[in-house]
């Protein structure tokens, strides 16, 4: 039956009305891929006292190291001057002209546009240094492409004494991994072509790393030299003696003298000595810088038993220490190509060498003793064994053992070196000096201590690389304090300790000794003017967990009668006057999952009732993130007092250009005043609107947000 004209008109009006209502939402809500690619980390600051003047904050962030862009915003929707000092571990520094108790947001992701993320903008308050040879006094260290490598033989770094000495400063150091303080595993996973030679260096990278074949630049392989046997014999003469890995049978002798080698046009890796004296090439040998040349690269050697004393194999991929520029340049068949990452090789590192002999039944592997090797085959099977036996040479930093395995149909090799059993010794004093005494943190064989004027303090804990080290000093009257924190990818180690000496103007200072290298990426220091505040009792910082950009975030303090209520899509906090009530009750969230993070311990719960109490102490700063789409709640519990935040007042006469987002016109006459009695959720709404507006440009759509203000 056909609809009459009146009904048709009514139906069209209804459809049109629905479209009009939905249309604004299509602009406000991006695609799922956009939302999912953006996350925010709330940072809660609570002051117990008034603080005048600008403040510089530092905060470690528990976020992945591979994120793209970011910006910092406060709860009023204003962009902040900020700098991401390190991404691994993530460590952010930002400036606030007039600090108050509020919540900040670190927003990051693929679709985020970076804002105020340059040292030029931030240089009003902090100086960031990438190493060069003129600014620093360096002994027993090498600077290459902005990365400083200290070799461990009484290596010392200080600022040039002609540079200004700071009366008060907070020093930041970005320390990359040494060669391998706590080795985990090294991985080579690829089809093994016939005649391949694979050299795996044990270096700064810790963790499993998959290497597709062929190993070329875009795969970011930091420690593989993969060779394929393809070239012909070279013309032999009396001046060419090459080291060769036999393509038909593994060469048993690893000690082959290499007199001076002239440049050869064939691609390959040339080992030579400019002094024309003999060089011994063996696993783990230290090859001087003159042992490499970049104008022609190949690996060659004496062909054993044939009378032919020169031979070459073409490399498909080569990586050597001399070609690293700030961890971003490698050489591929004579051409420099960029890669990503910050890796540092050391010439003294030992090597794991595999010779695949045309998929024979007796392939051989030279690997560290106690390492675990897993060989995978094309039929899906795998074979694992522990490397045992006598070292092929004495005097190596790690005993290397020759082992054999069935080599037909090999598709991958996995070498786990987490069981070296090697005692690697090192001691790093990182901090500052006033030329009378030294201060900072002392890291000895993985254990960290505070270090005050020659006295080693209590142990802070076991630390791992990479890390950020922050060390500073301040005075309260005539009493001087040294404070700092060590930030790793998994933990934060703060400290504050009184100095028995008056601290004079300071400069940067690092003193390192060890059997493995120490790599420093960059250094920052804050301004010398102003006063550092003792943070105990003055301010508390609570860094939340990463949450989706569309999460509702509440910044509250646990207390009897505190309720967080979810009703009809709205979320708000309220206080019920009941001194015997729990310190936090979740109302209306039955079925939600809870992640409770308290003192670095994570607990997972499920909300089983509509009035669900959460067992927490009172007077604890809480960051509560509620994602209604995934029906999940993340509660990050801060401390009543903390020393993990460092502040420094900026002179009052320092001017700061205002950088703010457009102020939206909210429905009704809602006026947000920092001194008003509005609850924290009203402040968050402004931040949320500003964040949404950042994703779509400067225009803010009005009239579709529903606010719930208690």
Curated annotation (Swiss-Prot):
TM regions (residue ranges) = 41-61, 76-95, 689-709
A GO CC annotation recorded here is: host cell membrane
As for subcellular location, the record says: Host membrane
Q: Which UniProt keywords apply?
A: Host membrane, Membrane, Signal, Transmembrane, Transmembrane helix
The membrane topology term of the UniProt record is: Multi-pass membrane protein
The signal peptide, as residue positions, is 1-33
- Its name, as the record gives it, is Putative transmembrane protein ORF710
């Amino acid at each position: 039956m056909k609809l009459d004209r009146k009904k048709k008109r009514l139906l069209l009006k209804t459809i049109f009305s629905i479209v009009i209502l939905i249309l604004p939402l299509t602009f406000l809500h991006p695609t799922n891929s956009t939302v999912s690619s953006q996350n925010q980390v709330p940072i809660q600051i609570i002051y117990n006292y008034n603080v005048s003047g600008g403040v510089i904050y530092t905060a470690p962030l528990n976020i992945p190291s591979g994120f793209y862009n970011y910006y910092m915003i406060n709860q009023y929707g204003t962009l902040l001057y900020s700098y991401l000092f390190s991404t691994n571990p993530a460590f952010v520094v930002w400036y606030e002209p007039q600090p108050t108790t509020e919540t900040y947001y670190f927003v990051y992701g693929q679709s985020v546009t970076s804002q105020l993320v340059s040292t030029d903008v931030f240089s009003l308050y902090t100086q960031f240094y990438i190493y060069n040879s003129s600014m620093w006094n360096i002994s027993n260290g090498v600077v290459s492409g902005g990365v400083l490598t200290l070799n461990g033989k009484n290596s010392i770094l200080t600022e040039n004494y002609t540079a200004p000495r700071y009366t008060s400063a907070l020093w930041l150091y970005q320390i990359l991994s040494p060669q391998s303080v706590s080795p985990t595993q090294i991985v080579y996973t690829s089809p093994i072509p016939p005649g391949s030679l694979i050299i795996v260096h044990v270096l700064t990278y810790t963790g499993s790393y998959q290497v597709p074949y062929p190993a070329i630049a875009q795969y970011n392989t930091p420690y593989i030299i993969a060779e394929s046997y393809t070239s012909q014999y070279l013309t032999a003469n009396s001046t060419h003696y090459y080291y060769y890995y036999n393509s038909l049978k593994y060469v048993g002798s690893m000690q082959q003298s290499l007199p001076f080698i002239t440049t050869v046009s064939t691609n390959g890796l040339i080992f030579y000595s400019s002094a024309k004296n003999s060089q011994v090439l063996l696993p783990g040998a230290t090859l001087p810088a003159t042992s490499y040349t970049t104008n022609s690269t190949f690996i060659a050697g004496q062909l054993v038993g044939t009378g032919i004393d020169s031979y070459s194999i073409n490399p498909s991929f080569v990586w050597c220490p001399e070609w690293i520029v700030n961890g971003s340049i490698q050489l591929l068949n004579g051409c420099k190509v960029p890669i990503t990452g910050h890796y540092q090789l050391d010439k003294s590192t030992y090597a794991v060498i595999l010779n695949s002999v045309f998929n024979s039944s007796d392939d051989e592997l030279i690997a560290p003793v106690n390492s675990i090797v897993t060989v995978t085959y094309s039929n899906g099977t795998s074979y694992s064994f522990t490397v045992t036996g006598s070292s092929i040479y004495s005097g190596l930093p790690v005993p290397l053992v020759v082992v054999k395995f069935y080599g037909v149909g090999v598709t991958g090799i996995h070498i786990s070196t987490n069981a070296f059993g090697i005692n690697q010794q090192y001691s790093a004093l990182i901090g500052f000096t006033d030329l009378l005494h030294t201060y900072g943190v002392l890291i000895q064989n993985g254990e960290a201590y505070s270090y005050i004027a020659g006295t080693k303090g209590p142990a802070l804990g076991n630390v791992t690389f990479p890390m950020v080290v922050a060390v500073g000093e301040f005075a309260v009257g005539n009493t001087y304090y040294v404070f700092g924190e060590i930030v790793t990818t998994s933990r934060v180690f703060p400290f504050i300790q009184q100095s028995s000496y008056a601290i004079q103007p300071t400069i940067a200072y690092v003193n390192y000794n060890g059997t493995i290298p120490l790599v420093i990426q960059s250094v920052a220091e804050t301004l010398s003017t102003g006063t550092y505040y003792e943070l105990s009792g003055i301010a508390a910082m609570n860094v939340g967990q990463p949450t989706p950009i569309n999460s509702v975030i509440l910044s509250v303090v646990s207390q009897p009668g505190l309720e967080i209520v979810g009703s009809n899509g709205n979320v708000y906090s309220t206080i019920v006057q009941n001194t015997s009530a729990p310190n936090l009750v979740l109302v209306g969230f039955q079925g939600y999952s809870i992640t409770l993070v308290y003192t670095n311990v994570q607990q997972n719960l499920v909300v089983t009732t509509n009035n669900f109490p959460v067992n927490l102490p009172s007077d604890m700063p809480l960051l509560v993130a509620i994602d209604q789409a995934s029906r999940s709640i993340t509660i990050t519990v801060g401390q009543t007092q903390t020393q993990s935040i460092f502040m420094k007042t900026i002179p009052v006469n320092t001017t700061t250009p205002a950088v703010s987002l457009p102020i939206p016109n909210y429905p009704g006459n809602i006026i947000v005043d920092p001194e008003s009695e509005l609850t924290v959720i009203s402040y968050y709404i402004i931040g949320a609107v500003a964040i949404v507006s950042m994703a779509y440009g400067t225009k803010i759509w009005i009239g579709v947000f529903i606010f719930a203000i208690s």
